[in-house]
Structure formats: C-alpha cells, structure tokens
Amino acid sequence: MTETSMRAGNIDVYGFLEPQSIQRSGQSQFESENYIKNWMQNSKRDVYLGAYLNGAHWQMVVILPKENVVIWFCSLHNKPDNYLKGIINRSVLFFNIFALALVSALKGLDDTQQSKSKTPARWIVVKCNRQKGSTECGYYVMHWMSTIILENFKNNWEMYFIDARPLEPERLKALRIQWAKYYLKVKNET
C-alpha cells in the first residue's frame, strides 16, 4: 500500500499500521498503544490505515487523529471489538492531548482547552461491501485501502462508502492477481 500511496502522490497523507503491531495476540495492550502513539507522533500523517485480524477475519480501521475520528470497515458488518477500540481510543486521546499541550507550550498559553481533547474518538461504522463467502475478507480490506488511497479520501466517509453489495467476482479476481504479482515481485527481490 505504501507503493500505491507513493504512485498516487499522497505518501505524506496516509500512514499504515503494521498488522502484527495492533493484534491482540503476540502484543500487550501497552505495546500496541505505544506503537500507534509513536507512529502517529513521528510520522505526522493525516490518515492511518490498519488491517486488523480478529480471530480468522480481516477487518480495517482508519484513524484520523487530528479529527478525533475512527472509521470502521468489516465485510461481515461486525462491530469493532473492545480490545481494538480501547487501544485506538487511548492512542488518539494521547495524541491529541500531547499535540494540544505542545501547541500551548509553544504559544505560552495555559492548557485550559485540554478538556476538549479528552473526548473519546468518534467511531463511524461505514456501510461497506459485505462478503458472500468465508475466505475473501483480506481482499475486501485491500480493496478499501486502495480505493481510499487512489481516490484520496480524507472525509465524508458515509458519502463514499454506501454500498453493502459484495464485490463483483471480476474485482475479487483482479485483486487476487494484483497481490499474487506483488508477492512474487517481493519474493524475487529477496
């Protein structure tokens, strides 16, 4: 996805969360939160996209920390689990409190406005494509990610994602071919 973002000319807009760093297995909540907080602070992107593996099902989260908004995508139309909501809410809260404190310190202001930054992130569950089968969830996540990047989406999520119909078989086939080619390219480079 980083290459797609580079080709689209918006690499400075989109950041990507490493799936293994936000999963429930193998990471503590503290480690996952630290990873997200550090990545948002250091990379300074507007939008962060993350593939999240919940059990055996891939889902997607889009974080807009400056807007205090999180967008949720699930091809089974499940709600986000409490683990993910917790680590993201705390990470976004920290990001906003830190950013406001930094601005206040630089401007010599008091931090009375910090109470505004303490509101939890607003979660938007979009009406996204619903998968028919049981194994194509990862392709749905890749479809949504590439759509967001190539169309340069940063707001009005409910206007863009309004179609609950499954992806067309031709689109799924194209995604499979695209990612198989990419995998082979990376494999041959190593």
Residue spans of the language-model regions?
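Predominantly extracellular/luminal regions of secreted and cell-surface proteins
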Residues: 1-5
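Cysteine protease-like catalytic core of ubiquitin/ubiquitin-like
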Residues: 7-190
